[in-house]
Regions:
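Amphipathic alpha-helical segments that line or abut small-molecule/effector binding pockets
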Residues: 36, 100-118, 164, 190, ...
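N-terminal intrinsically disordered/low-complexity leader segments
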Residues: 1-29, 205
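Hydrophobic/aromatic-rich alpha-helical bundle segments in the mid-to-C-terminal region
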Residues: 137-144, 148-205
């Protein structure tokens, strides 16, 4: 082998090694691409159409590449739900930081976060996963753990029947708009949210 061919071969090996190292160093980016593909399919066709083959095609990877990150459909759905809960956490924490009154702050932040979701992609994806909970025990546990985690850090109001009332009413308004359409006017919705906000400041008897 000539010296030129040797240098050329060494160069090819270096490029291949760099490519492999780059792929190994970027698993988080690949997972995000796969989750993005899953979100697109869920939003476009519903959670029932979320197959591993469909996600692999949407993301432009092999099924084997997908299975390396998410060995099953359940794990993919679980990861998608966890990601949405992280987004919720971020949004709710921002609302809480900007609320100077610590009493009932979590329930109030939850109310306003849910009230502002409307018909966004985030809202639709969260609704699809929420409606899948009855048949997905892992999702139910994730949601339960998320709520209980916030209630542990919450106060007397958040852990009271009034706190539950505020949060459940927020869920009802949101799911009603998504499943039944807009049956209430904006003024009526605003009035309900305003009244629930007032309740979040009430002292527990």
């Amino acid at each position: 082998m000539s010296q030129h061919e040797t240098y050329r071969l060494v160069g090819i090996i270096r490029v291949m090694n760099n490519s492999v190292q780059h792929r190994k160093k970027d698993p988080i980016k690949r997972q995000e691409e796969l989750l993005k593909a899953a979100r697109i399919i869920a939003g476009r066709e519903g959670i029932g159409s979320l197959s591993l083959n469909a996600v692999a095609r949407e993301a432009g990877v092999s099924k084997g590449g997908l299975l390396h990150h998410f060995p099953s459909k359940q794990e993919l759905i679980h990861a998608l739900f966890i990601q949405l809960l992280e987004i919720m956490d971020e949004r709710i924490n921002i609302i809480m930081v900007n609320d100077s009154n610590c009493y009932g702050r979590f329930s109030r932040a939850y109310l306003h976060y849910i009230g502002e979701l409307k018909e966004s992609d985030e809202s639709f994806q969260l609704a699809l996963l929420s409606l899948a909970m009855p048949t997905e025990p892992v999702l139910r546990k994730c949601w339960r753990d998320w709520v209980l985690g916030h209630l542990e850090k919450g106060d007397e109001f958040d852990n009271s029947y009034l706190g539950a009332l505020v949060r459940y009413a927020a869920d009802g308004l949101w799911l009603s708009a998504l499943t039944e359409g807009q049956t209430l006017s904006k003024q009526e919705c605003d009035a309900i949210v305003s009244r629930l906000t007032q309740i979040s400041f009430e002292k527990i008897d």
